[in-house]
Amino acid sequence: MPGGKGKSVGGKAGSKDAAGKTQKSHSAKAGLQFPCGRVKRFLKNNTQNKMRVGAKAAVYVTAVLEYLTAEVLELAGNAAKDLKVKRITPRHLQLAIRGDEELDTLIRATIAFGGVLPRINRALLLKVEQKKKNKSEA
């Protein structure tokens, strides 16, 4: 039936495969949990002169953010587990970040309510040890 009102052959309108497909987000395609679309929007809004941002760039930045977050949370969870508590607090985040040399150089920010790392100067330790030895000898 050329030219008449018949069933269309080929094309997107008549294919049954397109109707059965579900939409997948960029995050799902990349196997990520963090939202690629939101990261892309932030990248576009925060660049000078509203520069263009490629889809792959947004996926890459999202993957890096997700990896760093997982790394910090794993170390903070270990710190909380060592202290025998079930909730991660800013103190655990501080201990985790300052305990890892690479994360410490990357994250130089001050963490609110994180406290400080326990550290005693060696010179002070030597004086205390010498006093203990003098008392035990006398």
Swiss-Prot record:
Q: Which Pfam families match?
A: Histone, Histone_H2A_C
Origin: domain of life: Eukaryota
- For region Disordered, the annotated ranges are 1-32
Stretches with biased composition (Gly residues): 1-13
Molecular-function GO terms, alphabetical: chromatin DNA binding; identical protein binding; protein heterodimerization activity; RNA polymerase II cis-regulatory region sequence-specific DNA binding; structural constituent of chromatin
N6-acetyllysine is found on 5, 12
Organism classification: Eukaryota, Fungi, Dikarya, Ascomycota, Pezizomycotina
Q: Does the keyword Nucleus apply?
A: yes
Please name the SUPFAM superfamilies in this protein's record. Answer: Histone-fold (SSF47113)
- How is the protein modified post-translationally, according to the record? Acetylated once deposited into chromatin.
What GO CC terms are in its UniProt record? Answer: euchromatin; nucleosome; nucleus
Summarize the subunit comment.
The nucleosome is a histone octamer containing two molecules each of H2A, H2B, H3 and H4 assembled in one H3-H4 heterotetramer and two H2A-H2B heterodimers. The octamer wraps approximately 147 bp of DNA. H2A or its variant H2A.Z forms a heterodimer with H2B. H2A.Z associates with the vps72/swc2 subunit of the SWR1 chromatin remodeling complex. Also interacts with rbp1/DNA-directed RNA polymerase II largest subunit.
- Role: Variant histone H2A which can replace H2A in some nucleosomes. Nucleosomes wrap and compact DNA into chromatin, limiting DNA accessibility to the cellular machineries which require DNA as a template. Histones thereby play a central role in transcription regulation, DNA repair, DNA replication and chromosomal stability. DNA accessibility is regulated via a complex set of post-translational modifications of histones, also called histone code, and nucleosome remodeling.
Q: Which organism is it from?
A: Aspergillus clavatus (strain ATCC 1007 / CBS 513.65 / DSM 816 / NCTC 3887 / NRRL 1 / QM 1276 / 107)
Keyword line: Acetylation, Chromosome, DNA-binding, Nucleosome core, Nucleus
* Main localization (coarse): nucleus
Q: What is this protein called?
A: Histone H2A.Z
Localization per Swiss-Prot or TrEMBL:
Nucleus; Chromosome
